[in-house]
Curated annotation (Swiss-Prot):
Name this polypeptide is given: Integrator complex subunit 12
Database matches in CDD domains: PHD_Int12
A Pfam match: PHD
Biological role stated in the UniProt entry: Component of the integrator complex, a multiprotein complex that terminates RNA polymerase II (Pol II) transcription in the promoter-proximal region of genes.
Record's compositionally biased regions (Low complexity): 347-358, 396-437
PANTHER family in alphabetical order: INTEGRATOR COMPLEX SUBUNIT 12, NUCLEAR FACTOR-RELATED
Compositional bias segments (type: Basic residues): 449-462
Organism: Macaca fascicularis (Crab-eating macaque)
Record note on quaternary structure: Component of the Integrator complex, composed of core subunits INTS1, INTS2, INTS3, INTS4, INTS5, INTS6, INTS7, INTS8, INTS9/RC74, INTS10, INTS11/CPSF3L, INTS12, INTS13, INTS14 and INTS15. The core complex associates with protein phosphatase 2A subunits PPP2CA and PPP2R1A, to form the Integrator-PP2A (INTAC) complex.
Length: 462
């Protein structure tokens, strides 16, 4: 480049240098004329744009010089003024560039004018070669280095090259394979272990590099180990704490089914119409139909009638001996015996006609029909039958009342036999129906205590 430019532009450069460094007033006009000649000839048209692009800052300095020195010329040539200024700057730059090559000529031309004009020209001549050299040299160095390294670096930055060999070359059996986890590219041969054809070509498979597979295995092991240790502990602790709480209520429920607190069963009532004592038998059968809490309340209220019954029996023992009901078979006896098949034994206690103090219709005891509560009073003439049993169906064993209330019940011998039969009949019924209300209350208290103890133990453990 430099040699060809020197051959073409030597005379113009010499003239331009002479005009620039001369002290005469005509130098500016001569420079302008030279510029017009070069424009007319069209020489160096290919070289101008590159110089314009490389060094625009010199335009301002030459503009100032040309405006100061040539106000007349610039006014006379308004159309070509801008082009003239640009071309003069180009000439100055060209001269500065060719100075090292043409030292002899420049020294001869400058020898006369250097002491007179050092301030105006030297800053331009010193600064221009520095800027031109740096821009050109740096540009060339950057281009060469960019051509050598930019492709690889760009490929690495964009993630288009192999991470191992840092190259983008792809062969038929050595394609670039991308890891789905870290998105790094590997040649099939560069990766260890080498990628198989199936892994590289099958689109259904997801390929991971060796480093990512190791990391994923470690993470999987870490995530699997912690739940394995506490899981058995939780399983072992929960049954120990919860099993007694879960199982015991089940057993309690089984026990409670035998004692239904809020269930009211409708039992067939034995309606016996036998003279004056019909109301007593009906009331006793109605009260005996209660079960659960109602029967428990009836039990508590039975204390009063039992005392009345005691007094009546003592007076009966002092009175006249009564005829046995086994010999007398009144009309109402068979009806009572058959009615006892309905599930309730009727209990009617009446006194002798000779005892004036005791009323003919004593209040019926409320404990009738209650299992486990058929306890006979000492030497009384009242028979208590809990459930329909074969012994209660026999008319000779159970003492019943006839229509008037005048005939008395059996004596001590008859009462004892009735007691034994009633006890024997009540014992299977008690075993069938399970615990009484008192026992169920005790069981409930025990359960409450157990629950409280367990709650306290849980609090202590926490």
């Amino acid at each position: 480049m430099a040699a060809t430019v020197n051959l073409e532009l030597d005379p113009i450069f010499l003239k331009a240098l002479g005009f620039l460094h001369s002290k005469s007033k005509d130098s500016a006009e001569k420079l302008k004329a030279l510029l017009d000649e070069s424009l007319a000839r069209g020489i160096d048209s290919s070289y101008r744009p590159s110089q314009k692009d490389v060094e625009p800052p010199k335009i301002s300095s030459t503009k100032n010089i040309s405006i100061k020195q040539e106000p007349k010329i610039s006014s006379s040539l308004p159309s070509g003024n801008n082009n003239g200024k640009v071309l003069t700057t180009e000439k100055v730059k060209k001269e500065a560039e060719k100075r090292p090559a043409d030292k002899m000529k420049s020294d001869i031309t400058e020898g006369v004018d250097i002491p007179k004009k050092p301030r105006l020209e030297k800053p331009e001549t010193q600064s221009s070669p520095i800027t031109v050299q740096t821009s050109k040299d740096l540009a060339m160095a950057d281009l060469s280095s960019f051509e050598e390294t930019s492709a690889d670096d760009f490929a690495m930055e964009m993630g288009l090259a192999c991470v191992v060999c840092r190259q983008m070359m792809v062969a038929s059996g050595n394609q670039l394979v991308e890891c789905q986890e870290c998105h790094n590219l590997y040649h099939r041969d560069c990766h260890k272990p080498q990628v198989t054809d199936k892994e590289a070509n099958d689109p259904r498979l997801v390929w991971y590099c060796a480093r990512c597979t190791r990391q994923m295995k470690r993470m999987a092991q870490k995530t699997q180990k912690p739940p394995q240790k506490p899981a058995p502990a939780v399983v072992s602790v929960t049954p120990a704490v919860k099993d007694p709480l879960v199982k015991k209520p089940e057993t309690k429920l089984k026990q409670e089914t035998t004692f239904l607190a809020f269930k009211r069963t409708e039992v067939k009532t034995s309606t016996v119409i036998s003279g004056n004592s019909s109301s007593a038998s009906v009331s006793s059968s109605v009260t005996s139909g209660l079960t659960g809490w109602a029967a428990f309340a009836a039990k508590t209220s039975s204390a009063g009638p039992s005392t009345a019954k005691l007094s009546s029996t003592t007076q009966n023992s002092t009175g006249k001996p009564a005829t046995s009901s086994a010999n007398q078979k009144p009309v109402g006896l068979t009806g009572l015996a058959t009615s006892s098949k309905g599930g309730i034994g009727s209990k009617i206690g009446s006194n002798n006609s000779t005892t004036p103090t005791v009323p003919l219709k004593p209040p019926p005891p409320l404990t009738l029909g209650k299992t486990g509560l058929s306890r006979s009073v000492s030497c009384d003439n009242v028979s208590k039958v809990g459930l329909p049993s074969p012994s209660s169906l026999v008319p000779g064993n159970s003492s019943q009342l006839s229509g008037n209330g005048n005939t008395g019940t059996s004596g001590p011998s008859g009462s004892t036999t009735s007691k034994t039969t009633s006890e024997s009949s009540s014992s299977p019924s008690a075993s069938l129906k399970g615990p009484t209300s008192q026992e169920s209350q005790l069981n409930a208290m025990k359960r409450l205590q157990m629950v409280k103890k367990k709650a306290a133990q849980k609090k202590l453990k926490k």
